[in-house]
């Protein structure tokens, strides 16, 4: 959430804010700033963050940027809202050289909420207390890493019983599985972390590796219903099924699922059926598959032109029979799987003005989702929202008429956004990765 820094001050959600000071009559009424649409910033103006729009906001840097990450479910409990928060991320870097890459475990803790501005009547003693409080409120980051040859395109984490593992797509064309238990242990204790980085990290190797894709890829998803079952898709249009075997290994079916004609961009297992999954592709299609059929005949449903161009990302709702997709056309589309044969989405939203890079349904609220785009925006949406005809916002600023009613919030300030995830155990908490680093935030809207 940002506002113009200058004589006018507006917030990104389209709610005009009072001018800070000065005579604005010569400028006419305040205008809402719509990211990617204007009005353009004038000389001397810049966007500044409106901290009152955030319950919590933190940023983190890891050196080389991360193209992908996943949130690691922990044993700290569900529905955590009490601050400060603790969370764990597994991420992979995109470094300048292949040998400089790392698979990382991040422990972020002491994450406090945004601090209210000081009152006008605060005295010197209160200011000293605030300084002490500020020191205690500093966020903390522990980072354990292991060498990885090649940039990491995608990371997805799953628990195999009590064992956390990460599936890792490498730009070198391999898909690897890494055990994460040791990394989770050492980020809890500074001395253990120092010993690990000194003596152990170079020896950590994947517990399984598959090089049968004949090229790199990005699509990867663990089944939420069948422990250890994995799908991987590559830029050569092939999708392979991984089946866990006794002894902690996998059998990878060498027969690819046949249907797409270009790169497979994303994969999502059904949250309700063990054998069904969805895929999207640079061929503009979305397909629904059933692994009980032979790979050459497993495609059951197809929407051939789901977007005008590449379909980059999909997310299958855990609570409703809805599939969410985002494409190079900047559109977000909702597909009712009960009507998928019709080939038409039940809703289309066009807020992003560049390719959509990530989408995800809220894990607890069935109508809420988030998306990120190459236009440096993260948007939050709620399908249940309808504009109040008596509110008068549109009359106050006609620019609001173009905003979708379901748009809750627009977050900016990141550069080259790549991926976002809701925290499954901390309601409303979003984490994103971009060239500018990680951002952890919760807005007043969700």
Swiss-Prot record:
The keyword Nucleotide-binding does not apply. SUPFAM superfamilies: WD40 repeat-like. WD repeats lie at residues 54-110, 163-204, 205-250, 251-297, 298-343, 344-405, 406-442. GO terms for molecular function: chromatin binding; DNA replication origin binding; histone binding; RNA binding. Residues 1-38, 110-141 are annotated as: Disordered. Its main location: nucleus. One of its GO terms (cellular component) is nucleolus. Histone binding-protein that regulates chromatin dynamics and minichromosome maintenance (MCM) loading at replication origins, possibly by promoting chromatin openness. This is Glutamate-rich WD repeat-containing protein 1. It comes from Homo sapiens. The lineage of its organism: Eukaryota, Metazoa, Chordata, Craniata, Vertebrata. The gene is GRWD1.
